[in-house]
From Swiss-Prot:
The keyword Cell membrane applies. It comes from the Eukaryota. GO terms for biological process: endoplasmic reticulum-plasma membrane tethering; regulation of store-operated calcium entry. Coiled coil: none annotated. This is GRAM domain-containing protein 2A.
């Protein structure tokens, strides 16, 4: 009896469970009663572009890690610099003073900072980008092109040498110092003529791209600048008595008639130019002529520097050749003396031998 009662109880329990399951399936469940989905954690991993290869990805990752490391060092060393400043480049170099201070140059958008350690003492140099007035490429001992000279508005000059990648650092400084413009191939300086941008917007680009004729300077000026008209040529002769050509009136008239009424000056330098106190010439024309002179003098100075460098190299080459020849001659003489000593020792009789 007990076994039958137990089996009936188990059957009733199974029927109740089946009834509950069917009821739960038939009963509609609203969307509000469904549990909310678990939000996935954000993905902080780096996503590289599809075009990059494995080696390039590794290189970018290493550069990012090193820049992050240098950024922490930068803010730890220079606490006055705002935390928003991000290091763009760190380069190993030496600051030239009484002796070379080996350290690192930290370049950020608004600051140029140098740090060196000498006998446990920290040496720091902080240069605001706004105060930079000139950046010039420098040669260490006039031979090694591995330096940069930075001049500030307080006339302080900082020379950084032993730069392994000087050109890349120079290009980065040119992008950072937006208030500077290239004055030559090897230097950056403050923009000139900042007070009159309207009067020089047309003149300066035209003067840069327009070549100067060596025979006459007045022909290279733009057409919209007034200068001496042909009718006032006789009046200009009084300003230039030394440049007056030895020609008669008939020869001048003949030359003018051959050229259709226009004056053609046979010798260079005799043409009409704008004197210092000429009412028809505007001051912009004078500035244009001065700017042309500066543009012509720059390549001459660079050529002279190159000739001077070549001469120094020749002198050093001759000295090196002389040292090599003298050392070889001394080695030859030493070997001859050794041979003579050996021959004398062989010729001497052995002591105690008869």
């Amino acid at each position: 009896m007990t076994a039958l009662s137990r089996s009936e109880a188990t059957e009733e329990g199974g029927n109740q469970q089946m009834h509950r399951k069917t009821a739960s399936l038939n009963s509609p469940v609203s969307c509000k009663e469904k549990p909310d989905r678990v939000e996935e954690p954000p993905d902080y991993s780096l996503h590289w572009p599809e075009g990059l290869k494995g080696e390039e990805i590794k290189k970018c990752g290493r550069e990012g890690i090193t820049l992050n490391k240098y950024n922490q060092q930068y803010h730890k060393l220079f606490k006055d610099v705002p935390l928003e400043e991000v290091v763009l480049k760190v380069c190993s170099c030496a600051l030239q003073r009484d002796f070379l201070l080996q350290g690192r140059l930290y370049i950020s958008p608004n600051w140029l900072c140098f740090h060196a350690s000498l006998f446990g003492k920290d040496i720091k140099v902080v240069i605001p980008v706004v105060s930079v007035q000139m950046i010039k490429k420098h040669k260490m001992a006039r031979l090694l092109p591995n330096g940069l000279a930075i001049t500030t508005n307080t006339s302080q000059k900082y020379i950084f040498v032993s730069l392994l990648s000087r050109d890349s650092v120079y290009d980065l400084l040119r992008r950072v110092c937006t208030h500077l413009q290239p004055s030559s191939k090897k230097s950056l300086s403050v923009r000139e003529f900042s007070g009159e941008p309207e009067s020089l917007e047309v003149l300066i680009p035209e003067m840069k791209w327009r070549k100067v004729c060596p025979s006459s300077r007045s022909l290279s000026l733009p057409d919209n600048i007034p200068c001496i008209p042909p009718s006032s040529v006789d009046s200009t002769d009084s300003f230039f008595p030394s440049r007056k050509p030895p020609m008669s009136e008939k020869s001048r008239a003949q030359v003018a008639s051959e050229n259709g009424g226009r004056w053609a000056w046979p010798m260079p330098g005799w043409g009409p130019a704008c004197p210092k106190k000429m009412p028809n010439c505007s001051p912009t024309a004078k500035n244009a002529v001065y700017e042309e002179d500066e543009l012509e003098e720059e390549p001459r100075s660079t050529g002279e520097l190159r000739l001077w460098d070549y001469r120094l190299l020749k002198v050093f080459f001759v000295l090196i050749c002389f040292l090599v020849m003298s050392s070889s001659y001394l080695a030859f003489r030493i070997s001859r003396l050794e041979q003579q000593l050996c021959s004398l020792s062989w010729d001497d009789p052995v002591p105690g031998h008869r």
